[in-house]
Amino acid sequence: AIATVITFLILFTIFGNSLVILAVLTSRSLRAPQNLFLVSLAAADIMVATLIIPFSLANELLGYWYFRRTWCEVYLALDVLFCTSSIVHLCAISLDRYWAVSRALEYNSKRTPRRIKCIILTVWLIAAAISLPPLIYKGDQGPQPRGRPQCKLNQEAWYILSSSIGSFFAPCLIMILVYLRIYLIAKRSHRRGPGAKGGPRKGESKQPHSLDSGPSALANLPTLASSLAVAGEANGHSMPPGEKERETSEDPGTPTLPPSWPVLPNSGQGQKGGVCGASLEEEADKEEEEECGPPAVPASPATACNPPLQQPQGSQVLATLRGQVFLGRGVGAAGGQWWRRWAQLTREKRFTFVLAVVIGVFVLCWFPFFFSYSLGAICPQHCKVPHGLF
C-alpha cells in the first residue's frame, strides 16, 4: 500500500511540475521574468521525485541500503541539495513578492531575466554549500556496524545544526517575516485606496498643478463640461439653471481652472459682447465672423460658436481665447498607465496570498522532520526520537 501511494506521488510530482515548466516556457502570458523561479523550483522537485524518492522508498521497504556505498554518499548529498534548493527557492520567491509590493515602480524596472537568473544561481549555490560538506569532510567514520549496510545522514552535531538552520529554520523565519510585512502593506494600502496617496490631506490647500506633474495631476484637470461652463460664463453666456444644477450635482468636486491658465476675458471689462465672443479689435470681430459664419438654423448665442465637440479619448479640454483646446493624450495615457500599475499591484497581492498558503503547507510538512533531526544533535542521549516518526 505504501509503495502504491508513493509511486502515485512520484508520477504526480513529475507530471505536475513538467506541466508548470511547459506552461511557463510556451505561454506568452507567463513569460514574465519572475516565473523563472517557478521553472527552477519545478526542476528541483522533479529531481527529488526521480533521484531521491525511489531510492528512499527502496531503502524503507528493504530495511537496508541495497546499493553501493559511493552512491549512498552521493544520494544523501543530492537529497540535501534538492530539498534545500526547494526551500530556498520559496524564500527567494517571497522576497521577490515583497519587493514587488513594497517598491513596485522601482523594482519592476529592475526585475530583468538576467537579475532573476542571478538570484536563482545564488539559490543553487547556497544549497550546494550546505550539501557538499559531507562529501568533502568525512569526519570520524567509526566502526561499521555488522549486518546489512545502512545509509543515513551525517550524525555529527555541527553539521546537523548548521544544515538544519541553513536549509529550513533561517528561510522559514525570513518567509514568515516577509509575508507578515506584505500583509501589513496590503492592509494599509487597502484602507488608503488607490488615489489616497496623491490626494491632499486635511488642512492643506489645493495648489494648481502643471500639466507635466504626472498622473496625480489628473484629479486637478478640468473636465469637458467644467471647461465649457467657465468659457461660457466668461463670454457672458451663462448656462441654463437646470443644466447648471445638473452639472453641479453630477460633479460637485470638479476643480476650477488654475489662475495660470488663460480664460476668456469677462464681458464686463468694457468689451463688446457678440455672438462669437467679445473684443475691442475690429480684426477680432472679423475673425469671429469668419469662424462662425451665418448659421443655417436659428441658434442661441451660447451655441452659435460652440458646436458640440467630440472629445478625443484620453484627452482633457482647456478653455482658451480661441475656444477649447484638447490636450494631448499624454496625461490620459499616464493615468491609464497609473491604473495599470495599480492593477498589477493588486494581482501581486492576490498571488502573494495564494503563495503564502502554499508555503504555509510546505513549512508544516517539513517542520516535523527538521525538528526531530535537530533534536538528535541537541540532546542525543535524552531526546530519543522514534524511528517510525523520523
Curated annotation (Swiss-Prot):
GO terms for cellular component: cell surface; plasma membrane. It is a multi-pass membrane protein. Alpha-2 adrenergic receptors mediate the catecholamine-induced inhibition of adenylate cyclase through the action of G proteins. GO terms for biological process: platelet activation; regulation of smooth muscle contraction; regulation of vasoconstriction. It is found in: Cell membrane. GO terms for molecular function: alpha2-adrenergic receptor activity; epinephrine binding. Gene3D superfamilies: Rhodopsin 7-helix transmembrane proteins. Disulfide bonds join 72-151. Residues 280-292 have a biased composition (Acidic residues). This is Alpha-2B adrenergic receptor. InterPro entries: ADR_fam (IPR002233), ADRA2B_rcpt (IPR000207), GPCR_Rhodpsn (IPR000276), GPCR_Rhodpsn_7TM (IPR017452). It holds the Pfam family 7tm_1. PANTHER family: ADRENERGIC RECEPTOR-RELATED G-PROTEIN COUPLED RECEPTOR, ALPHA-2B ADRENERGIC RECEPTOR. Residues 63-72, 141-156, 379-390 are extracellular. The gene is ADRA2B. Residues 191-218, 233-311 are annotated as: Disordered. The chain crosses the membrane at residues 1-25, 37-62, 73-95, 118-140, 157-180, 355-378. Keywords: Cell membrane, Disulfide bond, G-protein coupled receptor, Membrane, Receptor, Transducer, Transmembrane, Transmembrane helix. SUPFAM superfamilies: Family A G protein-coupled receptor-like. Belongs to the G-protein coupled receptor 1 family. Adrenergic receptor subfamily. ADRA2B sub-subfamily. It comes from Dugong dugon (Dugong).
